[in-house]
Structure formats: C-alpha cells, structure tokens
A protein has these predicted regions:
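Macromolecular interaction modules
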Residues: 1-223
Length: 223
C-alpha cells in the first residue's frame, strides 16, 4: 500500500470556512470516484492554527492505493482529470505539492475523529543519506516518540526511494503524524521527560537550521 500526501493552500481571496466546505463536499465527491482508490482522508488545519498568521498549509489530503502502479493507472482516467479540473476552484496551484510515501507505524491505536492530529513535515539533516535518515527515524527516533504518554497514535510516512532518482529532491523527506486526545494533551506532552528525549535526538537526523513546519488538524475520513 502506498500513501500520497498532498500539501494544500487555499486559493487567494477564499475564506478558510469556504475552503473547508468546498473541499469536504464538492471536491470529496469527485475524488472518491477515482479507480483504485482504497482510502481517502482530509486533514483540515484547526482554527487556532490561524491565530498568529497563516499556517504552513490549510490542510493535507491523504490517499491510499495498492501500489504505485495502481496510482499511475488511476492518473490516466477521466475521473482523475475531473479531480485536477476542480482543484483551481479552491486550491492555490502555485503552492500545491505532494510526496508518495510508505507508512511505518510506531504506535498503533485507532485515531478517533475527535482527536487532534499533529502533522510535521520533516527534512533530513544536510549530508545525511536518505537510507541513514530513514533508518534513524524509524529505528531510534520512532520508539522515543512512541513513549510519550499522551501520544495515542504515531505514524511515520517515509518518502519512497523513487522520489530521489536522477538527483531529484522531494519537498520533504517524510511526514510525521501524531494523534492526541486534545490540544491540551498535546501541550502537556511537551512537559514530559519523554518529549525532551525526542527533542534531544532531533539534531541527529533532522535539519535543525530552521523550524520544522507543522499543522494541527481535524480529520475527515471520506473513504
């Protein structure tokens, strides 16, 4: 199973509310018609994410297919062309991007729709190979994060090797997804020794020359 994560900013002049409504209703009804689509989740940035200005993204769209082959086949269909044709109605196409990933579950528990969802966009530290980055993130850092008591679910989405062929560099090397019961629980997690251990490990594999972009979302499982 492969998972594509698309990073979305609303089109200029569109309100956050109108963007969310259009995405959840009109656009979702088009996407679910894609051949081969196994699962579709919309992750909408919560209102508090706008208190101090614009967040990194207004949301991310997550879609699952059985394989990259199935995904490519779907992209050749009229249904996919309909999806693309609808995007300018609510998305800023100058800022849209995506990664194709494989999930590595670090803490496996159900993600209830009432939970808040922390989505972090991760770039490996300069000079580190993709293989070493993924190995450390999954084998060392992941178990540290899973120990934080308030964490309900924790999934790492590792960008697939094909994204690096011919010297290419994807927008991010991975996406970390962590679910909490509430924003209060998320804030409380930052006071724990387990969280401090997570932060202390980050320079070992993450580019810390700038803050890690993130959004906090509520999720809508469309399919």
């Amino acid at each position: 199973m492969v998972k594509t994560i698309t990073f979305i900013k609303r089109k200029p002049g569109m309100s956050v509310d109108d963007f969310g409504q259009y995405w959840r209703k009109q656009h979702a009804a088009i996407v679910i018609k894609l051949p081969g689509l196994r699962r579709y989740v919309q992750c909408h940035t919560i209102p508090s994410g706008y208190r101090n200005g614009e967040p990194a993204y207004d949301g991310v769209a997550e879609v699952w297919f059985d394989s990259t082959g199935a995904m490519r086949e779907g992209a050749q269909t009229a249904e996919y062309r309909a999806v693309r044709a609808d995007e300018p109605n609510f998305i800023d196409l100058t800022k849209i991007d995506f990664v194709i990933t494989e999930e590595r579950v670090q803490k496996d528990a159900p993600a209830d729709p009432s939970m808040v969802h922390l989505v972090e966009f991760v770039t490996r530290k300069p000079g580190m190979s993709v293989e070493a980055f993924q190995r450390h993130w999954s084998g060392v850092h992941g178990p540290l994060g899973a120990k934080i008591p308030m964490v309900r679910r924790y999934v790492q989405c590792h960008v697939r090797p094909a994204a690096y062929r011919d010297g290419r560099q994807p927008p991010y090397d991975g996406v970390a997804e962590v679910w909490f019961d509430s924003t209060a629980a998320m804030r409380e997690s930052a006071t724990t020794p387990e969280y401090r251990a997570v932060r202390a490990d980050e320079p070992n594999f993450i580019d810390t020359t700038h803050p890690v972009p993130f959004i906090i979302t509520r999720d809508f499982a469309v399919l």
